[in-house]
Amino acid sequence: MIQVRGGGIYGCVIAHVLQSNHEVYLHEKEEELLRGASFNNFRRLHRGYHYPFSPRTVKASKKSFNFFTEVYKKFCSPIQIQYLIANEGSKIDIDSYLRFLREMRLPHGVTKSNSDLAEWGADCTEALYDITKLRKFFGKILTRGIAKKPDFVIDCTYADSPLIKKKNFRVL
């Protein structure tokens, strides 16, 4: 038996994936799922365009993006994003950034900015997820509650979470 703490996007997806092979309980302190950071943030699925100095993070972002947009495709829609390189104070120039995009196989176009602050950048496609539809979907398929004597507890809460004390289960 697995207890997932936190009904944000991470907690809901993890509970959904695990419930195909395990008994899973999702505990969220709010009445509705996807209300905290999952609701207040941009709800944009990142491919890794904004991590030019971390290939490992880009690979993880791409993998997560592909998983999410495949499994939850009916809740996702594409969005065009421009990543512009500042004329002054940037830690990367446009040529290095474009090389990074090619090396990481991130789809993009090159764009000339009309801003005085940035001359060049990349046109990129990412995705947004529909929080209202996902909330309804997860609300129907996930078992909410507190597990009695769980074998595992997965803490997917955000900054206001107290630490879990180890008792008769493993903390992952």
Spell out what each predicted region is.
Residues L18-E23, K73, A118-E119, L142-D151, ...:
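Short glycine/proline-enriched coil/turn segments at helix->beta-strand junctions
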Residues Q19-N40:
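Glycine-rich FAD pyrophosphate-binding loop
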Residues E126-L172:
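Predominantly flavin-linked oxidoreductase catalytic cores and closely associated redox partners
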Residues C12-Q19, L45, K74-P78, K165-L172:
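Active-site substrate-recognition segment that forms the wall
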Residues E30-L33, R44, P52-P55, T69, ...:
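Rossmann-like dinucleotide-binding core of oxidoreductases
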Residues M1-Y25:
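N-terminal Rossmann-like FAD-binding beta1-loop-alpha1 element of flavoenzymes
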Residues F42-W120:
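Dinucleotide-binding Rossmann-like beta1-alpha1 core, especially the glycine-rich loop
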